[in-house]
Amino acid sequence: MFAFEGFKWEIVEIFDWKGLKKLQTTFQNYLLILSMIVSIAVVVAIKNYDSLWSLITNSSDSSNFLTVGSILATISALLVSISWVIIQTSSDRLSNILMWIWVRDVRFLTFVVISFTTVFLFILISLTHVQLHVIDYGIIYYVIMLNFLMYALYIKAFANVINPKYAVDLILRDKDIGDKSGGYGDLTDAESRLFAVYEIIEKRIKVGDVYAVIKCLNMINKNFNKYWMFIKDEKREKYLRDFLRILSKLRVEYRKNCLNRKNKPYSKKGLEAFKKTEFIVSFYKTIEEKIKTRDINSINKFLSETYNNISNYEMFNDKTYLEIFVHHLKELLEKYEKEKNENKLDEEIFNELKDELEKLINKCNNKLRELESQNNN
């Protein structure tokens, strides 16, 4: 019960409620009543354990299966209903975003298929009065354990969906399928997903949740090379420019709402996170623009400037960030090599890119070794 109470207030802080106090109160009461029911059920089950066990062992197979199927169906329905209530009682636009993510999550679909198929089979067995041998119960126990494993995966997956950093990551990861969106709620085009990311981070900024903002930006930094719209989409330059403008706007909002908050010494790290993210996005954007011009000298000049300024960038004194940047450089090298092999990139341009990127990678690796030696001393 106490666990449900803590979870309730955590959810209240995460979401921007619709303004109707009644909805918020209804949801809180829903969780409170549910926690009381679960608590009472557990107490009653423990007190009457012997009676329940005797009833199960002395009854027929069909009634056992009906009982187990009913219990599993109840648990599944509760999990789905709780997640549905959490999504529906958030703000309208955030509700669309969460629903879009959730119904496309493989773990959610797997849970629905396995859980409700199991319940259907148990009830079907009970209705047909199938008598099983004792050895067959071993299989049934494994099936029940599989369902409880699915419950755990379901809860973990949903916790990720309502966590801003995972929500942002999931939205950006999805492959762009073109500008055929039927509306904001579909989030099927890159522009809609970029705006959804903006809204999620903006809401965290407005409530002063510095920690969540930093986590979102760090997640974007880490997985940037996995976002289709920025790496492989034909309009990636446009999306990179759009995202850079979004980050700039969010940074202004962050300065206004978070930087001068009392008891927030952590807030300055948010500006550092913005700076690091903008650098990564700007690097990808600039190199794509230079390649499009097919100007080898311009490409060399940009990468050489980055090479010469590695020691001057304060952000590269952060070992973790430098490792992320090296990872991005290696991914870019692989990407351009693949494009060259597919005749999408001139070999001459690729060779220049390869030389400059390898030099930059070596420079960063030297910087990493330098930082490691400083830490050891």
Curated annotation (Swiss-Prot):
UniProt topology in membrane: Multi-pass membrane protein
Residue intervals passing through the bilayer: 26-46, 67-87, 108-128, 135-155
Subcellular locations according to the entry: Cell membrane
Alphabetical UniProt keywords: Cell membrane, Membrane, Transmembrane, Transmembrane helix
First-listed, main subcellular location of the protein, grouped into a coarse class: membrane
GO cellular component: plasma membrane
The protein's name: Uncharacterized protein MJ0704
Record organism: Methanocaldococcus jannaschii (strain ATCC 43067 / DSM 2661 / JAL-1 / JCM 10045 / NBRC 100440) (Methanococcus jannaschii)
